[in-house]
């Protein structure tokens, strides 16, 4: 079984889409291993999470958005969880995906999902330092 990190972003709460997003993932038979609700995530966690983008012009705006409201951090587990949840997440131009069907903006796009095994390990350690990472790959 492979583990991956998902963040449900502030716009999902603002638009009452949290259950819809989590339901789409649940219907694909992924198991929640750990979950935390953050009424306002600490900015240092957000900055650490997005550190690879720290030199980009959008970094501060993205961090501001991520601390603008509640988020949920979730560790999901399942076969090929990283690639399958990334496909389910999609992008705003791909119908049939979470972002394609529900997102309105490139930044305020409802969900983040780890894009690789290395990212999953790193991101899970940021949001769930107490969780041991186990993968099948």
Curated annotation (Swiss-Prot):
SMART domains: NDK. CDD domains: NDPk_I (cd04413). It is an enzyme of class 2 (transferase). Its cofactor is Mg(2+). It comes from Acanthamoeba polyphaga mimivirus (APMV). It catalyses: a 2'-deoxyribonucleoside 5'-diphosphate + ATP = a 2'-deoxyribonucleoside 5'-triphosphate + ADP; a ribonucleoside 5'-diphosphate + ATP = a ribonucleoside 5'-triphosphate + ADP. PANTHER family: NUCLEOSIDE DIPHOSPHATE KINASE. ATP binds at residues 9, 58, 86, 99, 109. Belongs to the NDK family. Its EC number is 2.7.4.6. The active site is at residue 112. One of its GO terms (molecular function) is nucleoside diphosphate kinase activity. Pfam families: NDK. Keywords: ATP-binding, Kinase, Magnesium, Metal-binding, Nucleotide metabolism, Nucleotide-binding, Phosphoprotein, Transferase. Plays a role in the synthesis of nucleoside triphosphates. This activity may optimize the replication of the AT-rich (73%) viral genome in a thymidine-limited host environment. This is Nucleoside diphosphate kinase. One of its GO terms (biological process) is GTP biosynthetic process.
């Amino acid at each position: 079984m492979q583990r991956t990190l998902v963040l449900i972003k502030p716009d999902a709460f603002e638009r009452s889409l949290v259950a819809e997003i989590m339901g789409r993932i649940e219907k694909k038979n992924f198991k929640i291993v750990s979950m935390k609700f953050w009424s306002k995530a600490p900015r240092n966690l957000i900055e650490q999470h997005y550190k690879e983008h720290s030199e980009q012009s959008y970094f501060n705006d993205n961090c501001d958005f991520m601390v603008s409201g509640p988020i949920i951090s979730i560790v999901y587990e399942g076969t090929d969880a990283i690639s399958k949840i990334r496909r389910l997440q999609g992008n705003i131009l791909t119908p049939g995906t979470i972002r394609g069907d529900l997102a309105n903006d490139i930044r305020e796009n409802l969900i983040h999902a780890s894009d690789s095994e290395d990212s999953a390990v790193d991101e899970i350690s940021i949001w769930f330092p107490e969780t041991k990472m186990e993968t099948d790959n």
